């Protein structure tokens, strides 16, 4: 019976010792943005698309684009790009020159919530 006291902890610790990570520990972070973070564009983009490190739930996620005065300028239509759960996109009207702030909030497929913001500019 004494050997079971030693064996049980070893069995329970085996996944950690092998480096097996639980998928529940993951979060959806910004991997890539189009337009790129901090970019200066000569023309207005037609959309903002963010690629995340894992899939997101579009019904519980958002991307908002605000102008320098803080007014929302996107078309309020966040959607998965081509059905890819890692790519959330929002359409834009033709934007005048200026600086824009992208604010995003996502819930990943494992229900973790993350958020962030970045800017881009449309130059005259």
Residue ranges and their predicted role:
Residues 48-50, 54-76:
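Short, surface-exposed alpha-helix to beta-strand junction/turn motifs within ectodomains of secreted
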Residues 91, 96-105:
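A glycine-anchored, Pro-Gly-centered beta-turn/N-cap motif
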């Amino acid at each position: 019976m004494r050997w079971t006291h030693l064996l049980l902890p070893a069995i329970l610790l085996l996944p950690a010792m092998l480096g097996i990570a639980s998928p529940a520990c993951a979060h959806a972070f910004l991997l890539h943005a189009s337009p790129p973070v901090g970019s200066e564009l000569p023309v207005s983009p037609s959309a903002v698309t963010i690629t995340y490190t894992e899939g997101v739930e579009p019904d519980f996620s958002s991307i908002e684009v605000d102008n320098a005065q803080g007014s929302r300028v996107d078309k309020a239509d966040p959607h998965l790009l081509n059905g890819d759960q890692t790519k959330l996109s929002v359409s834009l009207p033709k934007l005048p020159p200026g600086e824009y702030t992208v604010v995003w909030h996502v819930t990943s497929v494992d229900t973790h919530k993350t958020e962030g913001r970045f800017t881009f500019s449309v130059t005259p």
